[in-house]
Amino acid sequence: LNAFIDHIHPLDIFAHLIVGAEGTLAFFSEVVLDTIDDPPLKTMGLVLFDSVASSMAALPVLVNEGADAVEMLDDASLRTAQYLNNPPYDPHQIADNSAALSFEFQKHHVNEIEHLTQSIPHALTLMGGHLPLGMISDDAQRLQLWNIRKGLYPTVGSMRKKGTSVITEDLCYDYRDLPKVVNELKLICHQWEYDDAVIFGHAKDGN
């Protein structure tokens, strides 16, 4: 009866009815998946800023130009690159309280990529950003840069002390609130002695 009492939407009621103490009472017999467009041309960059606030101030530049992905990494996240083979930048040069935006554009036409490789670095530099690698279109180099973001969780997990567990929290905010949120999270982690905490996420989506 809880399924009917606790939920209003028919799909929620159904979902809570099909799995119960007696087992699963329904299953998917057929699934139809739609493919998504995968443009053949991609260019990527990593832009460093002296603070989270500066990085978030530059986010609209990337969003308005149609960036397909924008990831925010705090200083602790950026330093995990030291555990990768041949990191694309020197992780020991990352300053305290700095942050970075890792971003990618996907296009169908060469002239679109050429425009972005000229306009984006210029716009980000005007906002105080530094692109140590410039814009990268080579697939192998892009993969190396993506591996920093994709490898964050396993890297942090592998560094934990014996007998400890990794704690993860997923938070969603308007990206305009992220500077305050990240700074307050850092203070909370420091207050409770989570000194090895890292903060990263999908900046364009505020997650």
Feature locations, PLM:
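Noncatalytic alpha-helical scaffold of FAD-dependent oxidoreductases
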Residues: L1-N207
